[in-house]
Amino acid sequence: MAKYAMVIDTRSCLGCGACIAACDLENDTEWRDGRRRTHVPEFFFGEFPNVTRLFVPRLCMHCENPPCVSVCPTGASYKNEDGVVLVHHDICIGCKYCIVACPYMARYLDERKGVIDKCTFCYDNRVTQGRLPACVETCVGHARIFGDLEDPNSEVYKLAKSGVAVQLRPDLLTDPKVFYIRRAVEE
């Protein structure tokens, strides 16, 4: 089995929003109260005129130890054999326990459907067909890299194992499968 992961290079992210649009189109989602499956907040460092702007794309971290799964009372939230954290919409009751449990704030209630929604790495509609997630395929800056974390020939494997790409909040012990290449603020 594969163990899918993503590396996001914050040095290459342009903040253009192509990943957001591709995700919305691919997954028939729409913007609701500022929540989407993926979003790209921007951060500013320094003082004028020496200001650095940084974009940090955020999505579900597809944790190895996902707190959202353990709190789900119906079993709707689960981690599949490829390590992708998903939601069975047909048994989700929209209780929001998983939203509260997620330390990365990656889940939201899709009010149109009354169920929890989040990034799926486009698992069912693309990855199982041998295609890349829509956000990866569309990224203008080539900032998103997707692959098998257990395949030594995979770029994701090489970046994660080299220490170049790091996890957000490793102190939470969730072991997220989305890694980031950091941009030095001084750049």
Regions picked out by a protein language model, each given a short descriptive name:
Residues 1-187:
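Non-ligating segments of multi-cofactor redox enzymes
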